[in-house]
Design a protein with these regions (language model features):
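Composition- and surface-driven signal marking solvent-exposed, interaction-prone regions
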Residues: 229, 276-280, 323, 346
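Glycine-rich phosphate-binding loops that contact phosphosugars or nucleotide phosphates
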Residues: 36, 43-194, 254, 266-313, ...
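Active-site phosphate/pyrophosphate-binding segments
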Residues: 11, 15-52, 144-262, 272, ...
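Internal helix-turn-beta structural module
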Residues: 308-310, 314-336, 340-342
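Hydrophobic membrane-spanning alpha-helices of multi-pass integral membrane proteins
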Residues: 261-269, 324
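Active-site-adjacent beta-strand anchor residues
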Residues: 20, 266, 320
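Residues at the start of alpha-helices and the adjacent loop-to-helix junctions
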Residues: 112, 156, 221-222, 275, ...
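Terminal amphipathic helices with adjacent charged low-complexity linkers/tails
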Residues: 2, 6-9, 167
């Protein structure tokens, strides 16, 4: 049955707010009842010569995290690669029976994700879909379907993103027989519940609501967090925003940084930490304030930051399940500060509504 959006909200709490705070409960439940599908899909994917992950927008960002999870936790190594659905459809060679494809699509209606799935099926390999409940019928051709949550009422997707990452992590753990990761995943909802209550998010947003540009910088799996945070800021608060890998930022983009910008550095312990530290130092030299998402015992980046957000200690590959949520909340409260409706992606404004109708997504 086709999903019908609920009536729009015109004030706080918007639908985006409700979805953000529903994430701990959703993450606790998202794998339940799907154990047999996990086992069967994991066995088929592990037997493939290569595995490709595909998505668009927020779903593409989930696949970037999934790529590293499949490579390390799922023990696929160099046999896995993530693609934007548009590029997979148009630029990647035709899959063959030795190729497994995992398509992530919350709504199940985006043209190029559907075409990527059709291309995967035509190749004869295994096709797995990670999607929301009540998603489009075009995904029904997949061999295996893993469900996240009900369709999001807000156009700025949040809960479907973290639930998709949770399913990718659980699938990787199933492929790799990683009991330690399975155990750590069980603790993520409790970490997240504590994280949601630890900061005065409206005060943080009020402090930085009028900045010229927002930079979100991370490395490793949190490159995806940086990209996702920037996308959420575009969608929900309509702000000028950049999301980027830490090393990429240091190779030129830093030159555009000004003192009236703000730089969010997403830097849990890991191989990218030292380069994230270099980003924080550069921002401080320019005079741009740094907001650091770091572990609570961090000393170096925290010392350079105007604000710190403490991230619980978890496996770096799982950290995007936590690091993205404070940035979702910052985005939401920044939207309120800027007088934006975070649910509509400006479709309620005539010019942007006409632009949206012309996009043929």
């Amino acid at each position: 049955m086709a999903w019908t959006p609920p009536p729009p909200r015109t004030g706080h709490p918007y639908y985006m707010h409700d979805a953000i705070y529903a994430q701990p409960g959703a993450l606790r439940l998202v794998t339940r009842g799907q154990e047999a599908t996990f086992a069967a899909a994991a066995e088929r994917l592990q037997a493939m010569e290569r595995v490709l992950l595909s998505g668009i927008g927020t779903s593409w960002h989930a696949t970037l995290v999934g790529e590293l999870l499949f490579a390390h936790v799922g023990r696929l190594g160099h046999r896995v690669r993530a693609f934007h659905s548009f590029e997979f459809k148009n630029s990647w060679p035709e899959p063959d029976p030795r190729t497994g494809v995992v398509v992530v699509s919350h709504r199940g209606t985006k043209r190029f994700s559907l075409e990527a799935l059709a291309k995967a099926k035509a190749g004869g390999g295994v096709a797995v879909v990670i999607t929301g409940k009540g998603s489009g019928e075009g995904l029904a051709i997949a061999d295996y379907t893993l469900r996240t949550v009900d369709q999001e009422a807000s156009a700025a997707h949040t809960i479907s993103y973290t639930c998709a990452m949770m399913l990718l992590a659980a699938l990787a753990a199933e492929m790799g027989g990683a009991d330690d990761v399975r155990h750590e995943l069980e603790g993520i909802p409790d970490h997240l519940a504590l994280l949601l209550g630890q900061e005065a998010w409206d005060d943080l947003a009020a402090r930085f609501a009028t900045r010229r540009c927002y930079y979100f910088i991370g490395g490793g799996p949190n490159t995806a967090t940086a990209l996702e945070a920037a996308l959420k800021m575009n969608e929900a608060s309509y702000a000028k925003t950049v999301g980027m890998n830490c090393e990429q930022f240091l190779h030129g983009p830093w030159a555009a940084l000004e003192a009236d910008d703000v730089v969010f550095v997403i830097a849990p312990p890991g191989p990218s930490y030292e380069r994230c530290l270099a980003v924080a130092r550069a921002a401080r030299e320019v005079g741009a304030p740094v907001v650091a998402l770091v572990r609570e015992d961090d000393k170096e980046i925290a010392a350079l930051a105007a604000e710190t957000i403490a991230i619980p200690p978890v496996n770096e590959l799982l950290s995007p399940l936590l690091t993205v949520v404070p940035l979702q909340l910052f985005t939401y409260h920044t939207a309120l500060q800027r007088g934006a409706n975070p649910d509509t992606m400006r479709a309620d404004q005539p010019a942007h509504g006409r632009a949206r109708a012309s996009l043929a997504l």
